[in-house]
Amino acid sequence: MDINIDDILADLDRDTTAVGSTPAPAGDDTTRLDDSAATVAADYSTLVTHWCNERVAPELLPYPHTLMARVLARLAAQIEHLETLSTGVLEQTLDRSAKLPLLCMEAELERLKFVVRSLLRCRLGKIDRFGLYLRQLDARSPGALQTLLSAQERVYYERHSAILLKLFNNAILRHMPAEMQAVDDTEGSVSMIDEPEWARFVFLYVREPAPDAPDPLLAVDDHGQPCYSVNIPELGEVVDLAVGGIYIMRYNVIKDLLMDGKVVLI
């Protein structure tokens, strides 16, 4: 078996957009971050951006359905491809240098698997914490969770919520007066629903807009620099966020820019 490292690396870099492509629910925000080219490198960069945003944002961000479908399909295909190549190498009496390319590819796959796992763990942690809030959101806006969660996350959320509510009822609530048995009471001095900390300060980087796509939200500040304007209700002021700049702002002030892919959290 003659292994050509150039052919192997070409397989890893080949654009496999068509693999595992599945329609995403309406409102999927994947294309807002990168809609120009669904290449392997672009998808990895977008995945890392989603990962960073999810780790910093106080709320659960929309699940990137289309992006994750492509990434997971490529990951499974490359793992299978690597196992096939490894089997062929082990059957040959070659020197150690022949195994080096396979070790490099395995390291790259482990790096990708780390990002995917970390992203999903972060999301599951928020689902656990904001279960009652998600329940309230689903009741207020039917269908909202279809965009916010993946199919697997939706199953996890429903089962986790059912188990938690059953535990609360059996251990505590059934022994209390009827007027105190609600787990989603918001009328008292302290709300029983744990919502995201909307006013938390976050660091953000203002992204440069695509050169071939005019942005109606983009303005020019007093120094002639392109910028986005945000309103700070507490101060009653409008602040210009220059493109390429790094700022610290309250999350609720820049949330819309984040959802539109104008800024990234750092």
Curated annotation (Swiss-Prot):
Q: Which InterPro entries match?
A: GINS_A (IPR021151), GINS_bundle-like_dom_sf (IPR036224), GINS_Sld5 (IPR008591), SLD5_C (IPR031633), Sld5_GINS_A (IPR038749)
Keyword Nucleus attributed:
yes
As for subcellular location, the record says: Nucleus
Biological process GO annotation list?
Answer: chromosome segregation; DNA-templated DNA replication; double-strand break repair via break-induced replication
One Pfam entry for this protein is SLD5_C
Q: Which UniProt keywords apply?
A: Chromosome partition, DNA replication, Nucleus
Could you name the Gene Ontology cellular component terms for this entry?
Answer: CMG complex; GINS complex; nuclear replication fork
UniProt cross-references to Gene3D superfamilies, sorted A to Z? 1.20.58.1030, 3.40.5.60
Listed under subunit, the entry gives:
Component of the GINS complex which is a heterotetramer of SLD5, PSF1, PSF2 and PSF3.
What does this protein do, in the record's words? The GINS complex plays an essential role in the initiation of DNA replication. Has a role in chromosome segregation.
Hey, which family's this protein in?
Belongs to the GINS4/SLD5 family.
This chain's protein is named DNA replication complex GINS protein SLD5
Species this protein is from: Eremothecium gossypii (strain ATCC 10895 / CBS 109.51 / FGSC 9923 / NRRL Y-1056)
Gene name for this UniProt entry: SLD5
